[in-house]
Amino acid sequence: MVTSAVEIVTLEPQPALAVHGDVAPPDLPGFFGRAFSSVPAAAAAAGVELVGPPFGLFPSMPGETVEVEAGFPVSAATGATAGTGEAEGVHDLLLPGGEVAQALHTGPYDKVGETYVAMESWMGEQGMVPAGPPWESYVSDPEAEPDPEQWRTLVCWPVTRGA
């Protein structure tokens, strides 16, 4: 597992389509698979384009279940709400803009927690604190790259200067 240096970038808010879930950790791969299959169909039906890799946004700290929004950034908001249209559960989401700490995790998904630990340490050293939920952009496609040691996940975490 390799974590790149953490850097601060400024992002614009990004429209996305996503599926929400409260998922037991062992069920996450299946949940992501279903979301990453249904969102492209919903985007096509709404006439918007996918404009980036799939992501998982994590609104709260994991416990017995993980709250997650899984989807894709899209070219424009669609007005979709969960439970409407042909792709039930797919809804508009806005990925946050502003200052974001980013680090590239290379390795299996089950080791990405190590990147979060490194980022939290870095934030503390820089006098920064989380300012919103983190998300992971899954840069590598496991179907195209079968070696988990080569998978790349961009971890993004909104930040602000600590008080």
Model-derived features: where do they sit?
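A solvent-exposed interaction/effector surface
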Residues: 1-163
